[in-house]
């Protein structure tokens, strides 16, 4: 298990087709060491942000999984709880990172963190002693405008936060 309880990672998603077709220009630069991001603005200059790790727009889904997904699953199999939390504004790349780009469900190379974690969990089941029994619980929630929605049960919306 890592000696750090929480890691903060950012992923700069690639421009989508609409952004590219409209002549959009990247405003974020990733520092070579992979821990800093520079955000340039036309009117206010440049801002610098530091993270445990930064994945740029050319990063591979596999690399993101290897850094954040695999260690969490390994820790879970050692008895710890694990959470991977995606946060960001609308269209910032949460779904791209967690699930994969639109239309990529059948393309293993483009699978996001969630399908890779699920595959890895079942791989770990296969490696375990046959007498060990596993129980898996998962939840997928969206918090938007301070409303919580269960993404696995569309009838459960505006859930209380405890």
Where would I find each of the regions flagged by the language model?
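Microtubule-binding structural modules
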Residues: 1-162
